[in-house]
Swiss-Prot record:
The keyword Ribonucleoprotein applies. This is Large ribosomal subunit protein bL28. GO terms for cellular component: ribonucleoprotein complex; ribosome. GO terms for biological process: translation. Keywords: Ribonucleoprotein, Ribosomal protein. GO terms for molecular function: structural constituent of ribosome. Gene3D superfamilies: Ribosomal protein L28/L24.
Length: 72
């Protein structure tokens, strides 16, 4: 699946867009994904991953150790 966050597992959700006249139209809500090159210290290399904005905050707080576990 191409639009899935590697760390958090966020993926598209489905729902309704609701107009002012209360008309409902089915729509797909995409996660806030960004392609990033991240340095993995354990492997001594850059890795290209798709991450959500929340995942980038998690990595900023905890480091890349969690991400390295997922890549193995």
């Amino acid at each position: 699946m191409s639009k899935v966050c590697l760390l958090t597992g966020k993926k598209p959700k489905y729902g309704n867009s609701v107009s002012h006249a209360n008309n409902h139209t089915r729509t797909r809500f995409e996660p806030n994904l960004h392609t990033k090159k991240i340095w993995i210290e354990e492997e001594k290399q850059f890795v290209k991953v798709k991450l959500s904005a929340k995942a980038m905050k998690i990595i900023a707080k905890t480091g890349t150790a969690e991400l390295a576990k997922l890549l193995k």
